Amino acid sequence: MNNADICYCGSQILFKDCCQKYLVGTQKAPTALALMKSRYCAYATHKVDYLLHTTHSSQQKDYTKTAILNWAKANEWQKLEIIAVTENTVEFKAYFLDENQQEQIHHEFSTFKKENDRWFYVDGKFE
């Protein structure tokens, strides 16, 4: 993907004007929704460090860089659908093709927490 491409999150905004600024660290995601969308983009672009840095410290022990990278690379990310949003939760569906090119849907209810003016992913419940 180059800077002239539409953002993976489905906003219909250029990637460079949407989630890329969060992934490269020039801005912090201002809301749980913005963080969730940027994390989807991080999976699509294999930005594992961003995923780890935006996971709440209480949960980081459950994630390894290698496991995240392997899962992100094994799948071809198709689209993101936002179902419902509150201040600190996001329900979404992430559509992707798995390593066998089979269409899959990851349906999650994610919880986020704001600390020191930064949003973090805490956990998710899956359908």
Model regions: which residues?
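Short beta-strand edge/turn micro-motifs at domain boundaries
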Residues: I105-E127
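Cysteine-centered loop/knuckle micro-motif
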Residues: D17-C19
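Short Cys/His-rich zinc-binding micro-motifs
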Residues: N2-I13
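Short Cys/His-rich micro-motifs in 6-15 aa windows
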Residues: K21-A29
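Short solvent-exposed beta->alpha transition segments
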Residues: D49, H53-I82
